């Protein structure tokens, strides 16, 4: 089972990725982890990556595809893999296709922007313990205070509405076009293209998990 998982920040991809990995016995592959591992290993490719990252540059798609091809040859990918955060752009998706990397399913966890803004901007955190609350879905007993210590809760910078809106803008301009790319490829050439699966990302974690599994096991 070779899967690409797509969805906006706050759509619940992380939770569903864990469910998919457990169910199908496949590793989650993120480009960040691959880049760090290559640098640590000190391979020729890793040294190249280190050089680019040291100057604050962007690692080329060609280098990332080379890393992907090496990574999926490893033993833990015998049953497949789950790509998280890759591909991010249509050129990366095309490079993956041209490199002959076979993908079985592209899963999109679909949640509308207003719901994501509500989910993320409503989060409150107790910094010392890491306890997370939500003003609507999981409120503290006393507004703005941690249940255990009574200390004040904070809203992380990443969860502020303005920041969430900016992150969504980036997603819509860069990654959302991938949905159209894979959908249209599946319509034109169903035999060669990955199966495109759109899963409604609103509901309980278990409901969404069941939708994902049902779609993948059709």
Swiss-Prot record:
Protein name: Adenylate kinase
SUPFAM superfamilies recorded: P-loop containing nucleoside triphosphate hydrolases (SSF52540)
Quaternary organization: Monomer.
Disulfide bonds: none
Domain text: Consists of three domains, a large central CORE domain and two small peripheral domains, NMPbind and LID, which undergo movements during catalysis. The LID domain closes over the site of phosphoryl transfer upon ATP binding. Assembling and dissambling the active center during each catalytic cycle provides an effective means to prevent ATP hydrolysis.
Main location: cytoplasm
Coiled-coil ranges per UniProt: none
Reaction catalyzed: AMP + ATP = 2 ADP
Record-listed AMP binding positions: 31, 36, 57-59, 85-88, 92, 156, 167
A Pfam match: ADK
Sequence similarity: Belongs to the adenylate kinase family.
Ligand binding (ATP): 10-15, 123, 132-133, 203
One term under GO cellular component: cytoplasm
Record lineage: Bacteria, Pseudomonadati, Pseudomonadota, Gammaproteobacteria, Oceanospirillales
Cross-referenced PROSITE patterns: ADENYLATE_KINASE
Superkingdom of the source species: Bacteria
Function as written in the Swiss-Prot or TrEMBL entry: Catalyzes the reversible transfer of the terminal phosphate group between ATP and AMP. Plays an important role in cellular energy homeostasis and in adenine nucleotide metabolism.
UniProt entry keywords in alphabetical sequence: ATP-binding, Cytoplasm, Kinase, Nucleotide biosynthesis, Nucleotide-binding, Transferase
Region NMP, annotated ranges: 30-59
Assigned EC number: 2.7.4.3
